[in-house]
């Protein structure tokens, strides 16, 4: 007959037997938990873990240790797909928006050209000229021509350079009246050797003295001769 100590030892060494319950499940410990617990106990943590801690990406197949890391990685894929979709739709939208803008610019150019032709490119007889010829003629006629009406004839004179009394026949007639005034005027003109001017005017029409002078001068004005 065994003593009490031997009986306890035999009970510890006896394998544990589990009885099935009424619903067919086993009591604790479960087989999976016992298997992983024994692997951790004998393997020092080198065995498998339950539940599995590896999560793979369905797009690129990359594996992550946690579900949170996989979720962040999937967000990157979603943003990339949204960006590619937006880029694929953007060229069509710009192509659709470009023709109205071009039409508006063309309308503005057409209106501007019509206004130039109607307002600035008409001769007295009503005929039209080319825009380039009109621009050149307008610049020359408005800035570099001098009209003198003498005995019903129109004379064109362009004087750009040194302005002196010798270039103006009206002043020359006044100066020729007295030699002293001529010398004084000549001395006064010598004080202003360099003078750039543009004179546009009408001298005499039908015996009436009418003058319209538009002068563009560079330098000081010469003294007037009385």
UniProtKB/Swiss-Prot annotation:
Q: Record the organism.
A: Arabidopsis thaliana (Mouse-ear cress)
Where mainly found?
nucleus
Q: Which PANTHER family match?
A: OS07G0101800 PROTEIN (PTHR45801), TRANSCRIPTIONAL REGULATOR RABBIT EARS-RELATED (PTHR45801:SF113)
Recorded GO CC terms = nucleus
- Point out the gene that encodes the protein: RBE
- Segments forming C2H2-type zinc fingers: 55-77
Keyword terms of this UniProt record: Developmental protein, Differentiation, Flowering, Metal-binding, Nucleus, Repressor, Transcription, Transcription regulation, Zinc, Zinc-finger
What is this protein's tissue specificity according to the annotation?
A: Strongly expressed in inflorescences and flowers, and weakly in siliques, seedlings and roots. In flowers, it is expressed in petal primordia and their precursor cells. Also expressed in the lateral root caps and the basal cells of lateral roots.
Q: Which GO terms describe its biological process?
A: cell differentiation; petal development; regulation of DNA-templated transcription; response to cold
Protein name (record): Probable transcriptional regulator RABBIT EARS
């Amino acid at each position: 007959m065994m003593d009490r100590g031997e009986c306890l030892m035999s009970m510890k060494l006896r394998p544990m037997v589990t009885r099935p319950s009424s619903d067919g499940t086993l009591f604790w410990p479960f087989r999976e938990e016992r298997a992983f617990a024994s692997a951790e106990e004998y393997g020092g943590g080198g065995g498998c873990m339950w539940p599995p801690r590896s999560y793979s990406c369905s797009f690129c197949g990359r594996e992550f240790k946690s579900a949170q890391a996989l979720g962040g990685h999937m967000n990157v894929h979603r943003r990339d797909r949204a960006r590619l979709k937006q880029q694929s739709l953007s060229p069509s939208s710009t192509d659709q928006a470009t023709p109205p803008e071009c039409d508006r610019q063309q309308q503005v150019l057409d209106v501007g050209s019509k206004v130039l032709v109607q307002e600035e490119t008409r001769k007295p007889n009503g005929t039209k000229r080319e825009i380039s010829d009109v621009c050149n003629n307008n610049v020359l006629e408005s800035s570099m021509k001098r009209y003198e009406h003498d005995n019903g004839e129109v004379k064109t004179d362009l004087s750009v350079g040194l302005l002196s009394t010798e270039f103006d026949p009206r002043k020359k007639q006044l100066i020729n009246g007295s030699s002293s005034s001529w010398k004084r005027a000549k001395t006064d003109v010598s004080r202003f050797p360099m003078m750039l001017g543009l004179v546009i005017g009408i001298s005499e029409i039908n015996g009436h003295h009418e003058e319209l002078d538009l002068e563009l001068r560079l330098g000081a004005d010469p003294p007037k001769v009385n």
